[in-house]
UniProtKB/Swiss-Prot annotation:
Annotated [DE]-X(4)-L-L repeat ranges: 45-51, 147-153, 483-489, 611-617
Full protein name: BLOC-3 complex member HPS1
Classification lineage: Eukaryota, Metazoa, Chordata, Craniata, Vertebrata
BP GO annotations: melanosome assembly; vesicle-mediated transport
GO CC term (a single one): BLOC-3 complex
One Pfam family per UniProt: Fuz_longin_2
Length: 667
């Protein structure tokens, strides 16, 4: 029984997500009255009525005490509530079936906030404008928007329960150097260069292209002018792709089962793709004429031989951190194209429009006014000494230039009003007046951002790559990977197997190795679905081990939050262990430090909530400014017959082996 709600301080619903059980509980609470013809209130109204006391009491406490509650459980512990205020929007997560704890609910809220940022960019910093985006006046648009984010939350919950990469929040690569090299060359030549040399691209610049097989990254290529993409942003893009084309739709052969023991750890190289005269079903689809005697067979079996490929989705506007003109800029507008090659295999292209530099200017100005607001809130003295602040002089120059170039009447008059109050020697404005003017300028800058990047988004009729150019890229990549298609789909389910580790590491049942500097992980396959299985099979043993691994991930996070970087304990017939450590670029282990202890209501540990590991690396690097520092994690499951000293020794050897393997550049 689950629910997520985003509301204003007045209990106006901006977004909600519920499962069937929660909806049923609402129907029981707001059951039919004596007049059976009287309709039940809309679900949105039911939620507003149910949670209004919680919202109002929380906001009142915040106003009166400058503090409020962030978590509580109802009588008898039936339901758990977690609340977090982001800007002017209150996020609430509820669980009533004891399947999620406080950390899980808080993580869900932070992921939802991150998804809002990816979709709306810097508009999320302004309470009034984000309300307009999340609650459009048109009911049809509102339903469509809410259904989109509801679907994303369902997809996130499914991936977190099924995929190791989402459980630990790290990227999982398909390990096959030869194929990866082939794909990188194809992405460079047939995607990035093909788009950027086309005269019909309309100013759009192709920056990044990557291939996904289910939720695993096969290859990634960036143009020379592109800045690096954060692992967290790449992981959320995988989430978006999985929402568009869920992996369970992949056509799999139910009659033929394979297990990991039947798949040796060897690479194979199929023959080059056939030319235009190739025989087989592909040429028939492209308009060739099959032999007459084969025509009926082809018609009957076409769907079996060639699974239906999903249609490409419409281009969509997304916002990702990037460098613009060698300056870091948060939430730069990009256009995302998801081009499915086959069910389960997708090509993703990211482009940037010529107006991207405007995002940098607006971001710098809004950041400057935010810092100015912070200074003004320190007291009246801060307002009096405003002109002497170096920050203000730089901000004034930037804003004068922007207003002159933009020429918008509204922001021009607001800026003149602000300057009259801030820099007047005879009648300087008070801190409260300056704060009010500051907020007004920020809102107008945010409105310009919204006008340029949201109202002109590709899905709202804005500019994007022509369809035939997208089709060309999709066709060329299909041709390149035709012979590898079946291998890739199997490889994605059997990426790494435990067989190759059992001889050197007896007693090892499972492991997850994460390079937190690059945000990438390595782990043996752990599938226990009806159609796919790992070495442990499909029975209760596979599900049992998976439950152990997921439980270890949660426990390791809780202990890391309390400052522990090593964990070793016995649970039944298993030893569970967790290690976090730092190394330099040469692979030498660095001296361990005491990591910060975090409160229970702090940002969740991971990449999607607030990129905890990037902050941890910065914290560690303070005392080593001249040395590149890397952070690693290892989670392992051993049989309890293994002595603990041997287990620790194995963990070190396993980490060394995986470190050496990860040196192969695949991106």
């Amino acid at each position: 029984m689950k629910c997520v709600l985003v509301a204003t301080e007045g209990a106006e619903v901006l977004f909600y997500w519920t499962d069937d059980e929660f909806e049923e509980s609402l129907r029981l609470k707001f059951g039919q009255s004596e007049n059976e013809e009287e309709e039940l209130p809309a679900l949105e109204d039911q939620l507003s009525t149910l949670l209004a006391p919680v919202i109002i009491s929380s906001m009142t406490m915040l106003e009166k005490l400058s503090d409020t509650y962030t978590c509580f459980s109802t009588e008898n512990g039936n339901s758990l509530y977690v609340l977090h205020l982001f800007g002017e929007c209150l996020f609430i997560a509820i669980n009533g079936d004891h399947t999620e704890n406080e950390g899980d609910l808080r993580r869900k809220l932070y992921v939802l906030k991150y998804l809002f940022e990816v979709h709306f960019g810097l508009v999320t910093v302004d309470g009034q404008l984000i309300r307009k985006e999340l609650r459009p006046p048109d009911l049809g648009q509102r339903v469509q928007l809410w259904e989109h984010f509801q679907s994303l939350l369902w997809t996130y919950s499914r991936l977190r329960e099924q995929e190791q990469c989402f459980a630990v929040e790290a990227l999982e690569r398909l390990i096959h150097p030869q194929l990866c090299e082939l794909c990188i060359e194809a992405l460079e030549r047939h995607v990035i260069q093909a788009v950027n040399t086309s005269s019909e691209r309309g100013g759009e610049e192709a920056l990044h292209a990557f291939l996904l097989v289910h939720s695993k990254l096969l290859a990634f290529y960036s143009s020379h002018s592109a800045s690096s993409l954060r692992p967290a942003d790449l992981l959320v893009l995988i989430l978006l792709v999985q929402d568009l084309y869920p992996s369970e739709n992949t056509v799999e052969d139910d009659t033929q089962e394979t297990d990991s023991f039947s798949l040796p750890e060897e690479y194979f190289t199929p023959a080059p793709s056939p030319g235009d005269q190739s025989s087989g079903s592909t040429i028939w689809l492209e308009g060739g004429t099959p032999p007459m005697e084969a025509l009926q067979i082809a018609e009957d079996t076409l769907q079996t031989l060639v699974p239906h490929c999903p249609a490409p989705s419409s281009p969509r506007r997304i916002f990702l951190d990037a460098n613009v003109k060698e300056s870091y800029c948060p939430l730069v507008p990009h256009t995302m194209y998801c081009l499915p090659l086959w069910p389960g295999i997708n090509l993703v292209l990211l482009t940037r429009s010529p107006s991207a530099p405007l995002a940098l200017v607006l971001s710098q100005l809004m950041d400057g006014f935010a810092m100015l607001e912070k200074k003004l809130k320190e007291g009246p003295e801060a307002g009096a000494s405003l002109r002497s602040q170096p920050l203000v002089g730089d901000l004034r120059q930037r804003m004068d230039k922007f207003v002159k170039n933009r020429g918008a009447q509204e922001i021009q008059s607001t800026w003149l009003e602000f300057k009259a109050k801030a820099f007047s020697k005879s009648e300087p404005g008070s801190s409260s007046e300056l704060l009010q003017a500051c907020g007004k300028l920020k809102r107008q800058l945010c409105a310009i951002y919204r006008l340029n990047f949201l109202t002109t988004a590709p899905n709202r009729g804005g500019p994007h790559l022509p369809q035939h150019l997208q089709d060309q890229v999709q066709r060329l990549m299909r041709e390149k990977l035709t012979d590898w298609k079946d291998f890739l789909l199997v490889k994605s389910r059997r990426n790494i197997t435990m067989v190759s580790y059992l001889e050197d590491f007896p007693g090892l049942v499972h492991f997850i190795y994460v390079d937190r500097t690059t945000g990438q992980m390595v782990a043996p396959s752990l599938n226990c679905s009806e159609k796919t299985s790992s070495e442990l099979g499909k029975g209760p043993l596979a599900a049992f081990v998976k439950t152990k691994v997921w439980s270890l991930i949660q426990l390791a996070r809780r202990y890391l939050q309390k400052g522990y970087t090593t964990l070793l304990f016995q649970e039944g017939d298993f030893y569970c262990s967790y290690f976090l450590w730092f190394e330099n670029d040469m692979g030498y282990k660095l001296q361990m430090i005491e990591v910060p202890v975090l409160s229970d209501d702090s940002v969740p540990i991971g990449m999607l909530g607030g990129d905890y590991y990037r902050k941890l690396l910065r914290y560690y690097s303070k005392n080593r400014p001249a040395e590149a520092v890397r952070c690693y994690e290892l989670l392992a499951l051993h049989l309890s017959v293994i002595p603990t000293d041997l287990l620790v020794q194995q963990a070190g050897q396993l980490a060394r082996r995986l470190w050496e393997a990860s040196r192969i550049p695949l991106l």
